[in-house]
Design a protein with these regions (language model features):
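Gly/Ser/Thr-rich loops at beta-strand to alpha-helix junctions
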Residues: 22-24, 113-120, 153-155, 207-212, ...
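Accessory terminal and edge-of-domain segments that mediate assembly/interaction
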Residues: 13, 23-41, 142-155, 160-176, ...
């Protein structure tokens, strides 16, 4: 279970949960994301007995969108935080069933339910205390990765406090499978955490940070450009033995400027940032350095 600050409609996940009510009213930025005006109702959707159903108009190549009926009336006894947490398990189960298996757990994103127009804005602590324990249980039982996407730093800090309380007394090695180097990794993680809290850490992002969002690593990008330049297999293997900067210089000579720019524009195009960018952008770091041409980290910030 991960916790980040950001925009759930922009995070690169397999599916995300969109809160609505029994009449399919969509509000705020959620409405804009699916082409509606805030407060407008979705047409051609019917609840099938479940509080979670897939949005029929999900776009190809984009994360699936699942609707959650979290609507309630004033004075409704269901206003308790558990009313909102109860949609997490059916969302995770249904979304996983609707995705093609890839060999790795799917990443499913959940907003802080009930704190916008849901009526729990004045009691967000209750929501965090209900959502996070349920997410921990569901992540394990359904074998999925879940990310709670908070809107803003204050929301993130509140969620992190609740998560710290949940895991108090448990070691990092117990919570995370770090393999045989767990001792070294835990020590280093604690050191970096202290630096981040003191705002003494500068982030350095390489191409691997963007790979999770579907962008190529530098070598894969160079291989794609070499393919566009129609290099033979022998020449490609010889090229790969060179420093990547030398590879780029040679490929630039093989392709005309416009063709090279078209290839780069096509290969470096991404609409959603990955979990890595979301986690890094959520750290209290004042500065960041990157060798990347994409703007995914900026989007996550």
């Amino acid at each position: 279970v991960h916790v980040v600050a950001g925009d759930i409609t922009k995070i690169g996940c397999d599916a995300w949960l969109l809160p609505t009510d029994g009449a399919f009213t969509i509000s705020g930025a959620f409405a804009e994301e699916i082409g509606l005006e805030s407060g407008q109702r979705l047409a051609n959707q019917v609840w099938d007995g479940s509080r979670v159903i897939r949005l029929e108009q999900s776009l190809a190549g984009r994360p699936q969108v699942w609707l959650a009926n979290v609507g309630r009336n004033p004075g409704d006894p269901r206003n308790e935080g558990s009313w909102y947490a109860d949609v997490i398990e059916p969302f995770a189960r249904s979304a996983k069933e609707g995705l093609e298996p890839t060999g790795v757990p799917p990443l499913l994103a959940i907003p802080v339910l009930g704190t916008g127009d849901g009526g729990m804005a004045a009691d967000k602590g209750t929501i965090y205390r209900e959502l996070l324990p349920e997410m921990l249980c569901v992540a394990e039982s359904q074998e999925v990765d879940l990310v709670l996407v908070c809107w803003g730093r204050r929301s993130l800090s509140a969620a992190q406090r609740v998560r710290r309380d949940l895991v108090a007394g448990r070691s990092l090695k117990e919570l995370w499978d770090m393999g045989p180097k767990a001792e070294v990794l835990v020590t280093e993680a604690q050191r970096l955490g202290e630096l981040a809290r003191d705002r003494q850490m500068v982030l350095f992002l390489g191409a691997g940070a963007s790979a999770g969002a579907g962008l190529p690593t530098w070598q894969r990008l160079l291989d794609d450009i070499a393919d566009e330049a129609k290099l033979s297999q022998d020449n490609l293997e010889a090229l790969r033995r060179l420093d990547m900067r030398d590879q780029a210089a040679i490929l630039e000579q093989r392709l005309t400027g416009s063709t090279l720019h078209e290839v780069l524009r096509d290969r470096l195009k991404a609409t959603e940032y990955g979990l890595t960018q979301g986690l890094l952008a959520s750290l209290p770091s004042r500065e960041a350095i990157t060798t990347n041409y994409d703007t995914l980290f900026e989007s996550a910030c």
